[in-house]
């Protein structure tokens, strides 16, 4: 429940401080709402003496009642690590929690903002793969994850990443092979002869779909990473492209981010001049805590305040016009 601040006047004297503390304590004792005593200036020596005499801490000091980003009902989608796969990122975008959110943040290893990801970035990447079949430096762990696969030749020297042109091997003569050398990722089915040729060519990776690999091929000394998957060749070929890290797909340029302490008036001016649909929100340590969109700014939740020991706006907390006055 959002707190209700109880404040006296500016340049507070002892009456103003004690009135705020007493009224907040009374309301907390008889009700279910959270009342917080607050002050609008420094504690005088006299007031501090009174507080010390009866064992009370001074009320929290507030500077303004202007609406801040922290007061908005902003979205809190799960932030994605830049190291997760595009496949997992897509699943996150399609989750119930994120379906209505235009974009979700991508973070670095420290939880700081790295980029923003929306379905349009994934769609754009997907279209690029139609004209460029090559992939570079896919972590083997990611590939195993998206293919639901397992390595069949763990005894060989295997790299941590794989690169190359992706091709589905079809039965054909050796001289007409579509792949050659280590710069290839080859997908085969129940084709032991084609699998043997791929291993002899020392391709970067051999993916065996819905088939068993002959034992002699498993025992061959090779640098080829051999992976078995329950997927068919077409699905395996598509999933390879979704194994790359989402940090290589997300938008990293022209990022607009706001902090929890930013005022909504200032945020609104920036948003109205921008074409982005979703904006990351950062805390005081620059960690991602959520996102906001234009509709969050339409009717922001106002801070609530009770005025004691005064009733003039000129003596009240700055930004009072943006607050909801609960009582005077």
Residue ranges of model-derived segments:
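Short linear loop/turn motifs
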Residues: 61-71, 137-142, 233-236
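Beta-strand/loop-dominated core regions that host nucleotide or nucleotide-derived cofactor-binding catalytic loops
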Residues: 97, 118-121, 125-136, 171-173, ...
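Low-complexity, flexible helical/coil segments
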Residues: 71-76, 139-145, 151-156, 202, ...
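Short, basic, glycine/proline-bearing loop/turn elements
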Residues: 71-79, 159-161, 179-185, 203-204, ...
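Feature captures the catalytic cores and cofactor-binding loops of soluble hydro-lyases/lyases
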Residues: 46, 168-250
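A signal for specific C-terminal beta-sheet/loop modules enriched in small/flexible residues
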Residues: 131-133, 203-223, 304-308, 315, ...
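Protease-associated
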Residues: 128-193
């Amino acid at each position: 429940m959002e707190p209700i601040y109880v404040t006296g006047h500016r340049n507070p004297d002892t009456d103003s401080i004690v009135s705020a503390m007493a009224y907040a304590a009374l309301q907390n004792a008889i009700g279910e709402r959270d009342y917080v005593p607050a002050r609008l200036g420094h504690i005088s020596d006299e007031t501090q003496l009174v507080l010390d005499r009866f064992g009370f801490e001074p009320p929290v000091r507030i500077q303004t009642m202007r609406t801040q980003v922290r007061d908005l009902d902003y979205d809190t989608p799960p932030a994605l690590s830049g190291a997760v796969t595009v496949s997992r990122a897509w699943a996150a975008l399609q989750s119930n929690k994120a379906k209505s959110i235009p974009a979700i943040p991508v973070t670095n290893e420290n939880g700081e903002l790295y980029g923003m990801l929306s379905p349009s970035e994934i769609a754009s990447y997907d279209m690029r793969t139609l004209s460029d079949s090559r992939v570079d430096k896919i972590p083997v762990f990611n590939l195993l994850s998206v293919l639901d696969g397992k390595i069949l030749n763990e005894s060989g020297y295997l790299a941590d990443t794989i690169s190359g042109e992706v091709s589905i091997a079809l039965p054909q003569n050796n001289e007409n092979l579509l792949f050659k050398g280590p710069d290839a990722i080859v997908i085969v089915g129940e084709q032991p002869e084609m699998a043997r040729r791929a291993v002899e060519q020392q391709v970067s990776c051999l993916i065996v779909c819905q088939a068993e690999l002959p034992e002699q091929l498993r025992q061959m000394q090779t640098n080829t990473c051999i992976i078995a998957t329950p997927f068919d060749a077409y699905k395996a070929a598509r999933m390879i492209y979704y194994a790359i890290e989402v940090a290589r797909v997300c938008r990293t340029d022209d990022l607009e981010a706001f902090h929890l302490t930013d005022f909504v008036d200032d945020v609104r001016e920036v948003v109205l001049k921008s074409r982005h649909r979703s904006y990351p929100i950062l805390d005081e340590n620059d960690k991602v805590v959520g996102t906001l969109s234009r509709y969050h700014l339409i009717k922001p939740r106002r801070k609530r305040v009770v005025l004691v020991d005064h009733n003039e706006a000129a003596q009240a907390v700055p930004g009072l016009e943006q607050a909801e006055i609960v009582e005077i």
